C-alpha cells in the first residue's frame, strides 16, 4: 500500500487521519524527522552566508549583483530540484543516473527516502535541495565583476542538471557507481566542493580575465581614455578566451587577458566577508551532521569533527599569514575556516577527532601555499573557488583515505566500512582517487561545454562588455546600488597614458575614490 503512488491523496477526507496512521511505517523515527527538518532550516542560512561572503570579496560596484545572483540562484535551483532534480539525484536508476519517476514530487509522499530509512522522502526533499543550492552558489560566484546575470542563471540550471545531479547519484545512491566501488564521501566533498571548484575554473576560463584598471604601476593596466584602446567585441567571447588561454590566439591584449598578471581588486568589505563566513560555519554544522539523517552517537562525532576541523583550518591560516607578513588577516582567517570546512565535509562521519584536526590543517596549508594559483595558471578566478573548494576538496578526500576508521562509522550501529590507511586498508586511496578525479573531470568538461553553448545563444552571451565591466555590474543590471553610489555615477578611474593623475571618462561621470571602485 505504501508504494502505491499517491495512495493517500485518493482517500476520502473523513478517513485521512486513519489513513496516515495506516500508511506511516513503524520504522520512521519522529526524532530523526525533527532533526532533519531542523537541519534544513539551519542549512538555509548558507544562502545568505555565501552571498555576503562573495559580495564582500568583490568591488563595491559589483557587490549587490552578487547578492542578487545568490538569491536568484536559490530560486532557480530549487525549482529545478522540484521539477526533476530530486528524481535524477535520488530515484533508483542505473549506476550512473537516476530517473524522472519522481519528477515534480510525483510518487513522493510517505515512501522512505531509501529502503530502510527512518525518514520519509518528503522530509529529505528540502534538505537535499539546499545541497544543490549551495553547490550552485559556490560555483556561480565565478561570474563576479564581469559575468551577466541571466546567462549565469541558465548555466546554473544546466549545471545542476548535468553535473551535480549525476555526481550526487554516483556518490550517495545505493547503486551509484562510486558508492558501490567503495569511495567514501560523507557530506559532499566531491559533489559539492570539488565539483563547484572545477566548474568555477571552467566558467572563469570561458569568461576571460577582468580588465586591469586603476593600477598605474602595472604595464597591462588601461591607461587611455580612448574607447578604441579597449579590446574589440570579437575578443570578448567564450571561444576566444579559451583560445587565448591555451595560446592558440595572439591578440594585442594578450598581456592583459592571456597568461600573466591578473587583476587584484581588494575585498571592499572585510566585515561583510566575516559575517558571511560565520553564517556558513553555523550552517555547516547541520549541513554535515544532518546528512546522517538520524540522531545517534555518530551525529555528535560529525558535529564535533566539523568544529574541530574548521577551527584548526582558521588557526593554521592565521599562523602562516603572521609568519609571512607579521600581521593577521581577517580575510585569511575566514578563508582558513572555509578550507577546514571543505576538508572535513567528505570525512566528518568517518574519522576520529584527531583525523578531523588533520582534515583542517592539511587543506589550510595546501590552499594557503597555493593562494596565488590563479596567477600561476593564468586564470582570473575572482573568488578563488577553485583553490579553496576544488583543491581543498581533493586534499580532504586524500586525508580521508588515510585517516578513515571503521569504528567511527559503526558508531551509528549500522554503517560498515573498511577504513583507510590508518587501519591498513591500502585500497581505499585508490577508491578516493577514482572519486575525486572523475568528479573533477566531469565537472570541468561539462561546465565548459555548457558555457560555450550558452554563449552561442543570441542574447545569452555570458560576459558583459568591457564598458559595462568598467561601470560595474550593479549599474548595468540592477535598479539599486549600495550606499555611496548613485545610478548616475560611473565609478571608473582610468589612468591617462601621459598623466600621473587619474581622469574620468565621459561628460557625466563622477570621479570616485579608489576604494569605491
From Swiss-Prot:
State the annotated membrane topology for this chain. Multi-pass membrane protein
* GO MF term list: ammonium channel activity; methylammonium transmembrane transporter activity
Which terms are listed as keywords in the entry? Ammonia transport, Membrane, Transmembrane, Transmembrane helix, Transport
SUPFAM superfamilies listed in its UniProt record: Ammonium transporter (SSF111352)
> Which ranges of this chain reside in the Cytoplasmic compartment per its record?
54-69, 140-148, 202-272, 321-327, 371-384, 454-517
Compartments reported by the entry: Membrane
Q: Which GO terms describe its cellular component?
A: fungal-type vacuole; plasma membrane
What top-level branch of life does the organism fall under? Eukaryota
Q: Which family does it belong to?
A: Belongs to the ammonia transporter channel (TC 1.A.11.2) family.
PANTHER family cross-referenced by the UniProt entry: AMMONIUM TRANSPORTER 3, AMMONIUM TRANSPORTER MEP2
What does this chain do? Transporter for ammonium to use as a nitrogen source.
Protein name (record): Ammonium transporter 3
Amino acid at each position: 500500500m505504501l508504494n502505491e503512488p499517491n495512495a493517500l491523496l485518493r482517500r476520502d477526507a473523513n478517513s485521512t487521519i486513519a489513513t496516515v496512521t495506516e500508511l506511516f511505517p513503524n520504522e520512521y523515527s519522529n526524532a530523526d524527522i525533527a532533526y532533519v527538518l531542523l537541519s534544513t532550516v539551519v542549512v538555509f542560512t548558507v544562502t545568505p552566508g555565501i552571498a555576503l561572503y562573495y559580495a564582500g570579496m568583490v568591488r563595491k560596484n559589483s557587490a549587490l549583483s552578487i547578492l542578487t545572483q545568490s538569491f536568484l540562484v536559490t530560486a532557480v535551483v530549487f525549482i529545478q530540484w522540484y521539477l526533476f532534480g530530486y528524481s535524477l539525484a535520488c530515484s533508483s536508476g542505473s549506476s550512473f543516473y537516476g530517473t524522472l519517476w519522481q519528477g515534480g514530487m510525483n510518487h513522493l509522499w510517505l515512501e522512505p527516502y531509501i529502503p530502510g530509512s527512518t525518514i520519509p522522502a518528503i522530509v529529505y526533499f528540502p534538505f537535499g535541495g539546499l545541497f544543490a543550492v549551495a553547490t550552485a552558489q559556490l560555483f556561480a560566484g565565478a561570474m563576479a565583476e564581469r559575468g551577466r546575470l541571466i546567462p549565469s542563471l541558465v548555466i546554473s540550471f544546466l549545471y545542476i542538471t548535468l553535473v551535480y545531479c549525476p555526481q550526487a547519484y554516483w556518490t550517495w545512491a545505493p547503486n551509484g557507481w562510486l558508492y558501490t566501488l567503495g569511495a567514501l564521501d560523507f557530506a559532499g566533498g566531491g559533489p559539492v566542493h570539488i565539483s563547484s571548484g572545477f566548474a568555477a575554473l571552467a566558467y572563469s576560463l570561458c569568461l576571460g580575465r577582468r580588465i586591469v584598471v586603476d593600477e598605474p604601476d602595472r604595464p597591462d593596466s588601461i591607461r587611455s581614455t580612448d574607447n578604441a584602446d579597449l579590446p574589440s567585441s570579437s575578443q570578448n567571447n567564450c571561444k576566444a578566451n579559451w583560445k587565448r588561454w591555451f595560446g592558440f590566439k595572439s591578440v594585442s591584449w594578450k598581456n592583459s587577458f592571456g597568461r600573466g598578471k591578473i587583476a587584484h581588486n581588494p575585498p571592499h568589505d572585510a566585515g561583510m566577508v566575516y559575517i558571511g563566513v560565520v553564517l556558513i560555519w553555523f550552517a555547516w554544522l547541520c549541513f554535515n551532521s544532518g546528512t546522517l539523517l538520524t540522531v545517534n552517537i555518530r551525529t555528535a562525532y560529525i558535529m564535533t569533527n566539523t568544529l574541530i576541523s574548521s577551527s584548526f583550518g582558521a588557526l593554521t591560516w592565521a599562523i602562516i599569514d603572521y609568519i609571512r607578513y607579521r600581521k593577521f588577516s581577517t580575510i585569511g582567517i575566514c578563508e582558513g575556516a572555509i578550507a577546514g570546512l571543505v576538508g572535513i565535509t567528505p570525512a566528518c562521519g568517518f574519522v576520529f577527532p584527531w583525523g578531523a584536526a588533520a582534515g583542517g590543517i592539511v587543506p589550510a596549508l595546501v590552499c594557503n601555499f597555493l593562494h596565488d594559483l590563479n596567477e600561476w595558471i593564468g586564470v582570473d578566478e575572482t573568488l578563488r573557488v577553485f583553490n579553496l573548494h576544488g583543491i581543498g576538496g581533493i586534499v580532504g578526500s586524500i586525508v580521508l583515505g588515510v585517516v578513515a576508521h571503521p569504528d567511527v562509522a559503526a558508531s551509528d550501529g549500522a554503517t560498515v566500512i573498511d577504513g583507510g590507511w590508518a587501519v591498513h586498508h591500502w585500497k581505499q586511496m585508490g577508491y578516493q582517487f577514482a572519486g575525486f578525479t572523475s568528479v573533477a573531470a566531469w565537472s570541468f568538461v561539462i561546465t565548459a561545454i555548457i558555457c560555450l553553448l550558452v554563449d552561442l545563444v543570441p542574447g545569452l552571451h555570458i560576459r558583459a562588455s568591457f564598458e559595462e565591466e568598467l561601470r560595474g555590474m550593479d549599474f548595468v543590471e540592477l535598479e539599486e546600488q549600495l550606499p555611496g553610489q548613485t545610478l548616475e555615477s560611473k565609478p571608473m578611474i582610468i589612468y591617462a597614458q601621459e598623466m600621473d593623475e587619474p581622469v574620468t571618462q565621459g561628460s557625466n561621470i563622477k570621479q570616485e575614490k579608489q576604494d569605491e571602485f
